[in-house]
Curated annotation (Swiss-Prot):
Tissues where the protein occurs: In developing pollen.
Reported modifications of this chain: Autophosphorylated mainly on threonine and serine residues.
Protein name: Shaggy-related protein kinase theta
Protein family according to the UniProt entry: Belongs to the protein kinase superfamily. CMGC Ser/Thr protein kinase family. GSK-3 subfamily.
Organism: Brassica napus
Transmembrane segments: none
Ranges of residues in domain Protein kinase: 134-418
Length: 468
């Protein structure tokens, strides 16, 4: 069933949102298990036919030339109708100015268990050169970009993650350039980097990262397997740290992550400190300069991207963060679209049909496009009856059609949903102290009003140097 028929069916009441155990609403379960934690990716032929839908699959280069002329009413815009978004390839589009390099999956080349990799670090800024050896232990993720494996530093015994990607010798690696700028408790840390070569004269970039053993995706799966909801204190902790990290990335580093999802959120299950990882899709967004719209994994993709917007903003990360928060509350994705186009249907089923002004804010080229009128589904019916109203309110503020109406990351951090974290004697479920939450730097708070600063930093932490 195509998008227009599905939407008209919903609008006429023939299709309803079915109930799901544990929630008051209609959220269909995704058919695909997303257990390809953070790094799996599938290579599609640039032009092929999806046999199940007769839908042509096109590469981003094909769609990049799509006309900006709006389609006639009751006809899907070409950018939505004549292609399937490459939602399973979040890494295939990284570096559009790098000629859309799609490196193959690495086989071997230093990733075999027990193999030792030796490199030299230092030698800059007065630091002496130092030889460091790593023993590969196990592969923790693979994809079209390369491979990530866990390794042990033989000199110190420290566990690290090494992300190994094929490097085009003609270009600098954007991910490396961005990671060198970053230093934040909620962003995975780059230890150092080095290049390696193969017998085929292939050049590989190796990013040595701090190793964090768990992902938010797997942490949530732990609860859903037991038919339980994640404790609200953990939802608060994880969502807060996502927002704090995004504020740092957006305001201090000046980059948009463009692939926020549970698989790209690392978490220490003892301290519950969260760190955003995988900056292979990240980019500094420059106003007026176009960007690819085929970015971000499907369930977490902002609607302006589905509409083919190329001059989007950091607000796409806030939409993704809202989707992650809703998923933590529900135990399953809020918008489980089965294709790029179905993703829009899932959004409309809950948010209702976007107004002409909302469509203009997402992509001004499609203001004349007419959708069947579907009423918004009340947010309080999406979640179970005992859900804190503050949680529902924050989700609704993040999941706005209009990018400029979404909370900024710093505004989200100050939301009342996180007031429990600011209480003087709050602790983790295991009795431990909370991870550092309020040790903001001057750069993180730059431009924030006095009122906002007072909301962000609890009274018992102000002026005390208390970092938690």
């Amino acid at each position: 069933m195509n998008v227009m028929r599905r939407l008209k069916s919903i609008a006429s009441g023939r299709t309803s949102i079915s109930s799901d155990p544990g929630v008051d609403s209609s959220l269909k379960r995704p058919k695909l298990d997303q257990d390809n934690d953070n790094l799996s990716s599938r290579g599609d032929d640039p032009m092929q036919v999806d046999q199940s839908t007769d839908m042509v699959v096109v590469s981003q280069d094909t769609v990049a030339g799509t006309s900006n002329v709006p389609p006639p009413p009751d006809q899907l815009p070409e950018v939505m109708n004549d292609m399937r978004l490459r939602e399973d390839e979040p890494h295939a589009n990284r570096g559009e100015e790098d000629k859309d390099m799609e490196p193959p999956i690495v086989n071997g080349c230093g990733t075999e268990t027990g193999q030792v990799i030796t490199t030299t670090v230092g030698g800059r800024d007065g630091k002496p050169k130092q030889t460091i050896s790593y023993m590969a232990q196990r592969v923790v993720g693979t994809g079209s970009f390369g491979v990530v494996f866990q390794a042990k530093c033989l000199e110190t015994g420290e566990q690290v993650a090494i992300k190994k990607v094929l490097q085009d010798k003609r270009y600098k690696n954007r991910e490396l350039q961005i990671m060198r700028l970053q230093d934040h408790p909620n962003v995975v840390r780059l230890r150092h980097s080095f290049f390696s070569t193969t017998d085929k004269d292939e050049l590989y970039l190796n990013l040595v990262l701090e190793f964090v053993p768990e992902t938010v995706y797997r942490a949530l799966k732990h609860y859903t397997k037991m038919n339980q909801h994640m404790p609200i204190i953990l939802v608060q902790l994880y969502t807060y740290q996502i927002c704090r990290a995004l504020n740092y990335l957006h305001r201090v580093v000046g980059v948009c992550h463009r692939d926020i999802k549970p698989q790209n959120l690392l978490v220490n299950t003892h301290t519950h400190q969260l760190k955003i990882c995988d900056f292979g899709s990240a980019k500094m967004l420059v106003p007026g300069e176009p960007n690819i719209s085929y970015i971000c994994s499907r369930y977490y993709r902002a609607p302006e991207l589905i509409f083919g917007a190329t001059e989007y903003t950091n607000a796409i990360d806030m939409w993704s963060g809202g989707c992650v928060m809703a998923e933590l509350l529900l135990g399953q994705p809020l918008f489980p679209g089965e294709s790029g186009i179905d993703q829009l249907v899932e959004i409309i089923k809950i948010l209702g049909t976007p107004t002409r002004e909302e469509i203009r804010c997402m992509n001004p080229n499609y203001t004349e496009f007419k959708f069947p009128q579907i009423k918004a589904h009340p947010w309080h019916k999406i979640f179970h009856k005992r859900m804190p109203p503050e949680a529902v309110d924050l989700v609704s503020r993040l999941l706005q059609y209009s990018p400029n109406l979404r909370c900024t990351a710093l505004e989200a951090c100050a939301h009342p949903f996180f007031d429990d974290l600011r209480a003087p004697n709050v602790s983790l479920p295991n009795g431990r102290a909370l991870p550092p939450l309020f040790n903001f730097t001057a750069q993180e708070l730059a431009g924030a009003s006095t009122e906002l600063r007072q909301r962000l930093i609890p009274a018992h932490c102000q002026g005390t140097g208390n970092s938690s």
